[in-house]
Amino acid sequence: MKKIILLASTVITLFAFTTLTNWKSDKAHSQLGFSITHLGISEVNGSFKNFDVNITSSKDDFSDAVVEATADIASINTGIEMRDKHLAGPDFFNAEKNPRLTFKSTSITPAGKNNYKLAGNLNLNGVTKPVTLDLWYRGTIENPMSKAPTSGFQVTGTIKRSDFNLGASFPAPMLSDEVKIKADGEFAKQ
């Protein structure tokens, strides 16, 4: 009987230390943005208005986090409606055929205090490629309004649009091949 109680206690203790916690992005305090160089002399910025990001982790420092993100391509916003429609069309993202972009992390590796390399698979325009992004964990506080634990993150990196068949008829220097990604977010513990 003592062995059964000891075994049960061990299992419960191990489960308690490996419980996964879900964190959901606070849309009012999060953004998924990008920038691209135009004609080699200026930056054009944009974002996706409709997106979701979820993080699952069993550690307080998020060193074992799994990040999953989706965005509606048709929600692309550069501030110019005509350009947004062109970007959502077949020359670039082809939102009708590929309505969402997705990202799912495959690993997270420490890269200094509160910094990580976030590797994962990005599916964009029907093409899936591995990417590695920089993740900065900005800390966790108790949100004074909701009283919920809230964590902040920033993700940055660069992808090549040619890897995802985006705008092939618009070569550099008209549009740079490199697209900078910048996402900022607050995440509430669920």
Residue ranges of model-derived segments:
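Bacterial Sec-dependent N-terminal signal peptides
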Residues: 1-24
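Low-complexity, acidic/polar, glycine-enriched regions of mature
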Residues: 17-190
